[in-house]
Amino acid sequence: MINAKKEFQQRVRNMIPGMRRVHQIHFVGIGGAGMGGIAEVLLNEGYAVTGSDIAESAVTNRLISLGAKIHFSHAASNVDNASVVVVSSAIKADNVEVVAAHEKRIPVIQRAQMLAEIMRFRHGIAVAGTHGKTTTTAMISMIYAQAGLDPTFVNGGLVKSAGTNAHLGCSRYLIAEADESDASFLHLQPMVSVVTNIEPDHMDTYHGDFDEMKRTYVNFLHNLPFYGLSVMCADDPVLLELIPQVGRPVITYGFSEEADYRIENYEQTGFQGHYSVITPAGERIDVLLNVPGKHNALNATAALAVAKEEGIENEAILAALADFQGAGRRFDQLGSFIRPNGKVMLVDDYGHHPTEVNVTIQAARKGWENKRIVMIFQPHRYSRTRDLFDDFVRVLSQVDLLIMLDVYPAGESPIAGADSRSLCRSIRNLGQVDPILVTDTAELPEIMDRVLQDGDLVLAQGAGNVSKLSRQLVELWTKA
């Protein structure tokens, strides 16, 4: 087994040149999904990987099982033997390990710079956009795997069919989620770029200027070679505005009549989608998609367009989409449970922007007709709550019962008027739903049992620790 692993690593090394004089790579904040995925690929390439984080997680446990040495505290000594230090956007410049690395003249680079280095000698496919990039990255990865191309992939969330968010393949293909939150996707030099949509988010990075954000996306697309390909959603008005500025080959997809890959006759049956795609050549492809919602049909059609343009056969594309198990925390069905007032279903979803929350609600309505939608919502970041306050009020008013948790700060300080109590007040004033504010999560199980009814669909929604709370409910309800 060890010899087989070394043989595989050598084959990859023979195909992809290594990083000169880099032996040990240290990740500060290694437990983040994006960081952990890159670390896993580098471990499998044969590099020594160390890291630090403040708490154990499924990501850190997996990396340790693969051979990484991880410290669960930050200390200057953690970087002693590092050739390079990789940091996520959440790590501040005054972090003790970052300071120590600078003092020792050890290079300190962003996560995306390391991803760009992995991509440098590969055929890179980068997926960017405000919404849908994790799922789209997973779909493209599974199509390429189904076609026997054994791609390397690095995703921001779990690719459930593969059981991991990163994989080192033995082909020239690398499929990666591109992170616009800190504009670090500008480091990437792919052959194919997908942009799913653009909406205001992470506006602190762009100095509150949406035009600056749009210019940054155009610059990202300019990183393509002149013979590269940009795949863009024709349903997004911002992308339509930007297409004339791209200056590279562009293929579009969407429900729009103008789309090159056009979706027709979408229907949802339960939690599956059925529709047709008309290709630029006029071919009609009938798709069965194993995840719900029109937003996922868009994600899947982006993946289909990439695959078709790269010469992958329909059989592999359709098989991968029909069997697609989803991405972690993207409408993740955790099971059905018997509660005091009847049977309920629990779904965990990462969506934390009003647009994402809205499409999740719509998909749930289609798949769970005539049933109540009960949402446990945890706002993520005070700044996002402030910037999108009215949109959150409008979208969250669509559910039948809303249980609101405190804002997950993600390192931010509170902002007056951008808290959960203010959200609840404004939602209540609309008169469509009367939110229940839960400030002590220890009370959540008792509250749930009091308010749930037979047949309810419970959506645990948000990017903070609401997922952990949903898993605690699963554990508690399984024992009951």
UniProtKB/Swiss-Prot annotation:
Top-level taxonomic group: Bacteria
Entry protein name: UDP-N-acetylmuramate--L-alanine ligase
GO function terms (MF aspect): ATP binding; UDP-N-acetylmuramate-L-alanine ligase activity
Protein species of origin: Mannheimia succiniciproducens (strain KCTC 0769BP / MBEL55E)
NCBIfam families (alphabetical): murC (TIGR01082)
Similarity section: Belongs to the MurCDEF family.
Keywords, alphabetical: ATP-binding, Cell cycle, Cell division, Cell shape, Cell wall biogenesis/degradation, Cytoplasm, Ligase, Nucleotide-binding, Peptidoglycan synthesis
GO cellular component, one term: cytoplasm
Pfam family, one: Mur_ligase_C
GO biological process, one term: peptidoglycan biosynthetic process
Gene that encodes it: murC
The enzyme's E.C. designation: 6.3.2.8
